[in-house]
Every structure is written in structure tokens, then in C-alpha cells.
Design a protein with these regions (language model features):
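Charged helix-capping and loop-helix junction motifs
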Residues: 75-76, 107-110, 149, 227-232
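N-terminal metal-binding scaffold of metallo-dependent hydrolase/deaminase domains
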Residues: 1-38
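Divalent metal-dependent hydrolysis catalytic cores, especially in the metallo-beta-lactamase
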Residues: 62, 78-107, 120-133, 160-171, ...
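Divalent metal-coordination and catalytic microenvironments
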Residues: 8, 27, 49, 60, ...
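Conserved small/polar residues in nucleotide/adenosyl-binding loops
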Residues: 278-285
Length: 285
């Protein structure tokens, strides 16, 4: 089936294209052009100046629509995912905060089952914790926070292949071994809820930690201890040229001036925006 969107405001790598046209065949984009002449045989859809842009890939969200992925049930997952689908997201990595092993296993079972469905928007499970620095716990559940334990994480990784990302504080005992192990299994290791300094970050990067979770949040920046000044986690991550970062781009978690700084240093290829949505009715909240 051939479909043509006309009178669209289209986001392209070169910027916004006004009064453009998108030609689609069987769900695949064939052409984006500033010519909105009707194509013979195409079903015309006049979007009347509305925005047309690529679907969002949400890499860090804890829930939505009044549901939390930590409920671990299929109903909770569906409710949250469907909420994201209403607002431009087309695929998602459901995120768990620091959890117990039974919670992780239940969520992983739900995730695995739903990923097997035709055209599933779920790309994998993201574990934010529970190997985090207690001093930087923030909104995490402190009773679940601990140091990396291979007797715990190895069986989880071996049994549940839906896990695609796991966050940790690299300064913790055992964190380097953890990073090397999970990256060897194809899981993204990300720095999170941490007090890591430059040597910690440099060593972590070499051990496989290539991403930073909600950059600037739950991690220190430049600081002073007595008469000496030290770089923080933030500056250390900037110095890792190929390390990617995610930012909560709501203007509250990170102010607009800092967002511009992140963009200026990391560039569009090494940063992304996340919504970090919990159980709010919609991302707008």
C-alpha cells in the first residue's frame, strides 16, 4: 500500500522542512521531499501543517499512565507502554529502579513474553541499580542497594537475555568485574548514582562503562575538599570523548544553559534526551 502525507512540517537532519511530503510504502519511508504534488496511486493524508518526525526511542522510563514497571506485571507494562505510544514514542526500554532479585526476575519474565509479540515496541529491559552508591541514592529504594555480587548478577544475566542495560556506581567494590562481565554479554554498562572521580571513570570506561545515566543528576561536579579542588563525575565523563550521556531535558533536572553545554561538548551523536517518566498520566506531566 502506498501512502503520501502532504502539507507536513517535517523534521530532517538538516532542520525543519515546511509544506513537505512523505511517501510511504508498506510501512517504510520511500521519500521525503518539499514537493507535495500527489503521487498517482497513493492514499493522500493531509496532515494540515502538523509535525512529522521520527518515532522516539525511549531508553529510560519507569512507567506511565499511572502504572510503574516495578509492578512487574503484564498489565502494568502494557498500561505504561501504551501511554508512551500516544506521545510519539515508537519503542522503549522499560526501566526498573533498584529492585530485589525476585522483582527483576518477574519483570524480566514479563518483558521477555511481551518482546516476543509481533511488532512489540519493547526493545529490552533496563536495570537502574541496584549496585549504586548509597550516598547518591536519590529516589532509589535504599533497602535494595548493595555492592555488585557475581553470585547474584551472573545467574540473572545467564537466565534473562532481555536485559540490555544495567547501571552501576563504578567506585564500588566489584564494579569493574561487573562492568567487564555484562559488556561481554552484550549488555550496556552505564554509570549512575555515583561519587566517582576521574580515575574511577577512566578505569570504568576501560572496563566497558560507555554511558552515563541522567547526566548531572545523582553525581557530583567540580568540588572543594578543604583547600584543594577536585574534578567530579561530570567533568570526568566529559573527558571521555566517546562516552555517551543521557539528560532529562525538562529544564528542571538540567537547566537549559547546561543542556546547551552538554550539546556543545558531547554533540548530537553522543547525547540523547530522556523523559524519566514514572507513573504520571502522560509525559506532559
Amino acid at each position: 500500500m502506498l501512502t503520501q502525507l502532504i502539507n507536513a512540517r517535517i523534521l530532517t537532519p538538516q532542520g525543519w522542512l515546511k509544506d513537505g511530503s512523505v511517501l510511504i510504502r508498506d510501512g517504510k519511508i520511500l521519500e521525503v521531499t518539499n514537493c507535495d504534488l500527489a503521487v498517482i496511486g497513493a492514499q493522500l493524508i493531509d496532515v494540515k501543517g502538523m509535525h512529522v518526525l521520527p518515532g522516539g526511542v525511549e531508553i529510560h522510563a519507569h512507567g506511565g499512565g499511572g502504572r510503574d514497571f516495578m509492578e512487574c506485571t503484564e498489565n502494568a507494562f502494557r498500561g505504561a507502554v501504551q501511554t508512551h505510544m500516544k506521545y510519539g514514542t515508537t519503542s522503549i526500554f522499560p526501566t526498573l529502579s533498584s529492585s530485589t532479585v525476585p522483582m527483576i526476575e518477574q519483570a524480566a519474565e514479563t518483558c521477555t513474553r511481551m518482546m516476543a509479540e509481533k511488532d512489540s515496541p519493547i526493545l529490552g529491559l533496563h536495570l537502574e541499580g541496584h549496585y549504586l552508591n548509597m550516598a547518591m541514592a536519590g529516589g532509589q529504594m535504599p533497602e535494595n542497594i548493595k555492592n555488585p555480587d557475581p553470585n547474584e548478577y551472573i545467574p540473572i544475566v545467564e537466565n534473562w537475555h532481555c536485559i540490555k542495560r544495567w547501571d552501576a556506581a563504578p567506585e564500588l567494590p566489584g564494579a569493574m568485574q561487573f562492568g567487564k562481565y555484562i559488556t561481554g554479554k552484550g549488555i550496556l554498562a552505564s554509570v549512575a548514582h555515583t561519587q566517582a572521580e576521574f580515575e574511577d571513570i577512566r578505569t570504568a570506561y576501560e572496563a566497558g562503562y560507555t554511558h552515563a545515566t541522567h547526566f548531572y543528576n545523582a553525581m557530583p561536579g567540580f568540588h572543594k575538599r578543604r583547600e584543594y579542588k577536585y574534578e567530579g563525575t561530570v567533568e570526568s565523563i566529559y573527558l571521555m570523548d566517546d562516552m555517551t550521556v543521557e539528560v532529562v531535558a525538562d529544564g528542571i533536572h538540567v537547566p537549559p544553559t547546561i543542556l546547551r553545554l552538554v550539546y556543545k561538548i558531547k554533540g548530537v551523536e553522543r547525547m540523547c534526551a530522556i523523559c524519566l517518566l514514572y507513573t504520571s498520566p502522560s509525559p506532559r506531566d
